[in-house]
A protein has these predicted regions:
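Short, charge/polar-rich alpha-helical segments
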Residues: 3-41
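Short, flexible coil/linker elements and helix-boundary hinge sites characteristic
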Residues: 4, 19, 37, 50-53, ...
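Generic detector of low-complexity/intrinsically disordered segments
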Residues: 8, 16, 24, 44, ...
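Extended alpha-helical coiled-coil "stalk/arm" regions
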Residues: 29-68
Length: 100
């Protein structure tokens, strides 16, 4: 089976459709930043609770430390998402120049 070779117009049309996907991913940036902010605030709160000796009342996590560690992992994932969004911005800019 022979692969079809796309002409320039077809390539630009395909890339134009891909820009919508990139734009939607980039729109998540503000919500990801807000998640990080909220997670950091929660860590401060939990550390304060732990330091004050407040009773641990949570059935999901074994301890304050386990809960805090889970949140730190979520922050790392969110920071990775922000890095990917920055790459998508560069990619979008390049595609927009290509299809212009």
């Amino acid at each position: 089976m022979e692969a079809k070779v796309m002409n320039a117009t077809e390539k630009k049309e395909l890339m134009g459709k891909y820009t919508k996907k990139l734009e939607n991913a980039i729109k998540r940036e503000a919500s990801v930043m807000k998640e990080i902010e909220n997670d950091k605030a929660l860590i401060k709160y939990l550390e304060g609770q732990k330091t004050s000796g407040a009773a641990f009342d949570n059935t999901v996590y074994e301890s304050y430390d386990a809960w805090i560690e889970t949140i730190r992992k979520q922050i790392k994932k969110s920071e990775s998402t922000l890095t990917n969004i920055e790459f998508k911005k560069v990619e979008l800019e390049a595609i927009q120049k290509y299809i212009a």
